[in-house]
Amino acid sequence: TGLAIDPVRQRLYVVDTPSHDVKVFDLASGMPVKTLGRRGEGEGEFNFPTYAALDRGGRLYVTDSLNMRVQVFDAQGGFVTAFGKHGDGSGDFSAPKGVAVDSEGHIYVADAGFDNIQIFDGKGQLLLYLGGAGQSPGQFWLPTGLFIDGRDRIYAADSYNSRVQIFQYLNVQSTGKPER
């Protein structure tokens, strides 16, 4: 379902939802390099993974949809950690979908069940969330895909509202003023 490209290591990550794994390809040759995961509930195992994203250090974040978590792998494909669980509390997931990482390492997860985007720190602790159910700007109806560009603009595919919403993350430098 999801794709992520690592231009530094020349790798293409393909989330293969029905196979419950992530296939890694060499960008130059198109040849397979390795496969991450298999069906299961353990570390590095998946139950219908859907989306993937990379941070600046080459860590891979994979939405493990039916295990209700995000799994993190190092640049070599080794399991690092996972966060999230099914529930209705802060930081829990109902239907995790898209995942993206900003320039400061914050992890964004679109949750189609809660109609929001949850933002986590690098340790998987919830910082805040955006949205809620609705059709107004800043509200969502089944958000799915996420992408964050090089200027920290957050693009959210708001599926049933038939739109893409764009948000801007404002970095606060040592001056205390938002960066533009």
What is each model feature region?
Residues 1-180:
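Eukaryotic scaffold repeat domains enriched in small/polar residues
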